[in-house]
Amino acid sequence: MKERLTITLDKDILQSLDATIDGVTIRNRSHAIERLLDMALMHSNPRKAVLLAGGPFVSFHGKQIPKPMVPINGRPIIDYVVRELKRNKITDIIIVSSETGMISEYFANENRLGVKISYVVEDTRKGTEGALYIAKGLLGRDPFFVMNSDCIFKINLEDVYKQHVATNAVATMVLVTQEVTHKFGLTKVTGLKVTSFVEKPKVENTDVKLINAGIYLFNPAILSKIRLGTKPVMFETDLFPKMAEEGILYSYVFSGLWAKLDMWNLENSVTRLSKVASEGLKNGG
């Protein structure tokens, strides 16, 4: 139940307030004030993230290792993700994997990074959606990030959160531009809404270049939409296409540092990411 409130504002503040009204996500002054108060009273950024670290092992230099443990300049690629979360003040991290031994051994002294890491073990491969499903008991009532563990990136996650709140989204997907798109989840966007999502399209699309970066911000309401199956259930082929069709999947387009491990050409990809990490993360990460 809402109550009427009368307030007096300076003219300059009122002009700034009116500038946020777009008639769609912010309908009027009352709505603008309510939304800004919501943003001010909530945490500046979610403090929890789920890292999806499952999938089959990969062969690297004669050894079978989990993909998140592939070394980039002497550090597992998942280490870059954890450090980027810490840089964004996200310190409660849940890692979901079918094999956590090597990962947990590496992060045995996570206190040195200033984070708390919990582990959820898949008894069988669950897929990206299934992995979140088995971790939902650790998520609480606040928004949370979910991301892949095979990318190097540098992003202001607070900006993602601010847009997520402003659009009243249940799910926000970070998008990046790529020239070659057939290896990724390809999106079409109208305004901020994702209107179409196709995972790894068979035919290269020369018109659409926005792809899924594997970084998501979810409200707890998403947990009622995900499912666990007898076979792996994927965000990319199950949840996201449905949400795009329903018009409830939002996007955040990102133009900063982002590079993904390419399993089709692993050795060259490691070389490329080593260069990206050396040149792009000079000031931390």
Task: Give names to the regions the model predicted.
Residues 184-195:
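Acceptor/aglycone-binding surface of glycosyltransferases and processive sugar-polymer synthases
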Residues 78, 135, 150, 164, ...:
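Residue-level signal for inorganic ion chemistry
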Residues 112-114, 166, 189, 246:
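Short, well-ordered coil/turn elements that cap or connect secondary structure elements
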Residues 43, 87, 138-141, 154, ...:
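Alpha-helix termination/capping residues and helix-transition junctions
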Residues 167-177:
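A short, conserved acidic/glycine-rich loop-to-beta-strand motif
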Residues 69, 187-189, 251:
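A structural signal for short hydrophobic beta-strand segments in well-ordered beta-sheet cores
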Residues 22, 26-31, 145, 152, ...:
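Catalytic-core segments of class I nucleotidyltransferases/pyrophosphorylases
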Residues 2-6, 11-51, 56-59, 63-64, ...:
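Conserved N-terminal catalytic core of the sugar/cofactor nucleotidyltransferase
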